[in-house]
């Protein structure tokens, strides 16, 4: 357990209120007890100091759970500088506790867009000069993009990037395809212990929590439309169904759509015959006019466009649980309709105030579970952040930046961690639940063609 220290002689941070540090520390202590995989890694590798010499730039939601991640990285030898990857997701008491522990952190809930970029750049620089960072831990890809575009000289010294989320992985793969990615990256998002836990089970827990905190609405008996049925969509649909909502799914992928059907959801489209004509008359007004709640979950752009927003039932709640705020056309809403703040991250959007024709928009179209609530529980984030620690160790050990220049191109990649590491995280999580895993006998292992200690499934196995 890290101790609070005097910050009188430490000013390398900016948080909302440093006096919240004691509260944050109490919650961090509780979270540690709910993160068995991360804490097991901390104790297993503490003596070895595998991250000694690592200087990590971190840009991920500055929550209580992230504080446990940060202190695990520090316990394994790393230095870190931190910012949040979303203007609304910081928990101010968590940021204060990390600052009070002597870790440079620049994050507060309710940043402006300009402040958000400023915070990222404060992690990149120290005393006005680029910090001698050699590792990156990112969520969404904004830090990675700023480094490549504005601080390219720093990439000569960086061994790799570990990326947390679907959106960030898409950006990395796009950079790789275009020849723009200058350092290797580990795709943490597609580790099973991240994608199934965080994306699916985490959203199952946190979406309904956020909507109820924001609106105080009863959800049972009302109609919901979930846009997307990937892992985030699956968890989101389950979250609303367990509240008693009547849930329908919109999908572009026939495999995901088939899964939705098999899970008992009706697959529909917000467009007539599923075709987006780019015009108001192409919208399925009958569907949208009876929808009480619309949730976007895709990581794609404009999946709830202006024509859908115009057609939605008056009083409908609109929110997003994908990474960025461009899934819902909030620009159109700002340019054309009157906004009235009810409380932080809850706005009434008047399409016609005289007629009280309105929508309820949560978190301004950004991540609703972190804007209107506290995100996923510690036990969920345990798997994600254990993978982040292993990814940082994996990349730091391989020392990409120290390779001869002619060897670097063939060592660029975006890849997931080896399956055995994924299984290691899962094992620690099961042990944290008090579960007992059965061990294969040697004849059994031979029969199915695996080692007794794993890995147990081929890399292309679909869990």
UniProtKB/Swiss-Prot annotation:
Catalytic reaction equation(s): S-adenosyl-L-homocysteine + H2O = L-homocysteine + adenosine
InterPro entries assigned to the protein according to its UniProt record, in alphabetical order: Adenosylhomocyst_ase-like_sf, Adenosylhomocysteinase-like, Ado_hCys_hydrolase_NAD-bd, NAD(P)-bd_dom_sf, S-Ado-L-homoCys_hydrolase_CS
Cofactor binding note of this UniProt entry: Binds 1 NAD(+) per subunit.
SUPFAM superfamilies linked to this entry: Formate/glycerate dehydrogenase catalytic domain-like, NAD(P)-binding Rossmann-fold domains
Binding sites annotated in the UniProt record for substrate: 63, 139, 164, 194, 198
Superkingdom: Bacteria
Cofactor list: NAD(+)
Catalytic activity, EC: 3.13.2.1
Keywords, ordered alphabetically: Cytoplasm, Hydrolase, NAD, One-carbon metabolism
A single GO BP: S-adenosylmethionine cycle
Keyword Cytoplasm: yes
Gene Ontology cellular component terms for the protein in this record: cytosol
Location of the protein in the cell: Cytoplasm
Main subcellular location: cytoplasm
EC top class, as a word: hydrolase
Binding site for NAD(+): 165-167, 199, 228-233, 251, 300, 321-323, 369
GO molecular function terms listed in the Swiss-Prot or TrEMBL record: adenosylhomocysteinase activity
Involved pathway(s): Amino-acid biosynthesis; L-homocysteine biosynthesis; L-homocysteine from S-adenosyl-L-homocysteine: step 1/1
NCBIfam families: ahcY (TIGR00936), PRK05476.2-3 (NF004005)
Cross-referenced HAMAP family: AdoHcyase (MF_00563)
Entry function: May play a key role in the regulation of the intracellular concentration of adenosylhomocysteine.
Record-stated family: Belongs to the adenosylhomocysteinase family.
Protein name as it appears in the record: Adenosylhomocysteinase
Higher taxonomy: Bacteria, Pseudomonadati, Pseudomonadota, Gammaproteobacteria, Oceanospirillales
Protein encoded by which gene: ahcY
């Amino acid at each position: 357990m890290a101790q609070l220290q005097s910050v009188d002689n430490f000013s390398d941070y900016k948080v909302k209120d440093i006096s919240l540090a004691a509260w944050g520390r109490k919650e961090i202590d509780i979270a540690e007890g709910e993160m068995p995989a991360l804490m097991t890694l901390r104790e297993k590798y503490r003596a070895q100091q595998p991250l000694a010499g690592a200087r990590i730039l971190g840009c991920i939601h500055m929550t209580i759970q992230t504080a446990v991640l940060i202190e695990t990285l520090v316990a394994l030898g790393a230095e870190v500088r931190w910012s949040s990857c979303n203007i609304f997701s910081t928990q101010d008491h968590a940021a204060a506790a990390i600052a009070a522990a002597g870790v440079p952190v620049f994050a507060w809930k309710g940043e402006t867009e300009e402040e958000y970029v400023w915070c990222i750049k404060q992690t990149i620089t120290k005393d006005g000069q680029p910090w001698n960072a050699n590792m990156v831990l990112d969520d969404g890809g904004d830090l990675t993009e700023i480094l490549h575009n504005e601080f390219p000289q720093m990439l000569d010294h960086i061994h790799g990037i570990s990326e947390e989320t679907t959106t960030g992985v898409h950006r990395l793969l796009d950079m790789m395809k275009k020849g723009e990615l200058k350092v290797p990256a580990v795709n943490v998002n597609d580790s099973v212990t991240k994608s199934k836990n965080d994306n699916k089970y985490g959203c199952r827990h946190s979406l309904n929590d956020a909507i109820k905190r924001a609106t105080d609405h009863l959800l049972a008996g009302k109609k919901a439309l979930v846009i997307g049925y990937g892992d985030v969509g699956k968890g989101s649909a389950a979250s609303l169904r367990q509240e008693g909502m009547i849930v329908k799914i919109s999908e572009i992928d026939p495999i995901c759509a088939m899964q939705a059907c098999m899970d008992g959801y009706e697959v529909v489209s917000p467009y007539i015959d599923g075709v987006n004509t780019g015009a108001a008359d192409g919208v399925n007004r009958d569907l949208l006019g009876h929808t009480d709640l619309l949730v976007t979950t895709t990581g794609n752009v404009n999946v709830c466009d202006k024509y859908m927003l115009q057609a939605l039932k008056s009083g409908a709640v609109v929110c997003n649980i994908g990474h960025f705020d461009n899934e819902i056309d909030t620009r159109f809403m700002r340019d054309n309709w009157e906004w009235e703040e009810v409380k932080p991250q809850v706005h009434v959007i008047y399409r016609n105030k005289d007629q009280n024709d309105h929508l309820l928009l949560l978190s301004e179209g950004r991540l609703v579970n972190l804007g209107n609530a506290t995100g996923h529980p510690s036990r969920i984030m345990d798997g994600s952040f254990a993978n982040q620690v292993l990814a940082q160790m994996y990349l730091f050990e391989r020392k990409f930046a120290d390779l001869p220049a002619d060897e670097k191109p063939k060592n660029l990649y975006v890849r997931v961690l080896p399956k055995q590491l994924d299984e290691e995280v899962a094992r620690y999580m099961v042990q944290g639940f008090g579960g007992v895993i059965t061990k294969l006998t040697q004849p059994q292992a031979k029969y199915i063609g695996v080692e007794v200690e794993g890995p147990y499934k081929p890399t292309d196995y679909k869990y």
